[in-house]
Amino acid sequence: MVSLPILYSFRRCPYAIRARLALLHSNSIVELREVVLRDRPLSLLEYSPKGTVPVLVLPNGEILEESMDIMLWCIGEEMLIGDWQELVELNDNEFKVNLDRYKYPDRFDDAASMEFHRNKCLEILNSFNQRLDGGFMMGNGLTIADLILVPFVRQFANTDRDWFEQQDIPNVKRWMNGILQSELFISSMTKYKQWQDDDDLAYFPK
């Protein structure tokens, strides 16, 4: 049997979610190792001492330790099209920084008020709302840009769902809900038991 790439993943991590979405989008199959972050398997730390997920170990021994590198490996040619890089920078820097301080204010010494960071995220979502007039982030069809962003918008929405639903960002809500209800996203969130170093193989997608 041909060796498959190995993906170390954590189901709820937005970075791991977007890596799994890219794998599904590209019809890739991997061996999946579901990680509990407080109980990381030794093999993960041997491949990637920083111990974060996702990590993709390729059959040739190459190790991809960042979600964007995994997405590039999955769908490289699509990632040469459009201005998705600007969206990545906005999401992974400004939006994620404020999202973390909104969701986990006690973890950050430099955090301002919860409302401050929530409103900073909302400013970005308002810009997304205008961009989504065409249905998706880069026009009228699902692209890599949507897969990059939706796990983080979902995390923001779920932090205080009642508040989120009161905001005037109808395009964002429609876009997010449409993706979350899609077979692609539902498949990306399939539950796996925690993987141990001596467990049998588990494959993604199932």
Regions found by a protein language model. Give the residues of each.
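GST-like domain detector, emphasizing the conserved glutathione-binding G-site
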Residues: 1-129, 134
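Generic structural signal for secondary-structure transition and capping sites
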Residues: 96, 133, 161, 181-185
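Acidic, serine/threonine/proline-rich low-complexity intrinsically disordered regions
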Residues: 112-115, 161-167
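Extended, well-ordered alpha-helical scaffold segments
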Residues: 116-120, 124, 167-181
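Catalytic cores of nucleotide-enabled group-transfer and carboxylate-activating enzymes in metabolic
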Residues: 126-131, 150-158, 180
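Surface-exposed helix-capping loop/turn segments at secondary-structure junctions
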Residues: 130-140, 184-188
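GST superfamily/GST-like fold recognition
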Residues: 137-162
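Acidic/histidine-enriched, glycine/proline-rich intrinsically disordered or flexible terminal extensions
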Residues: 192-206
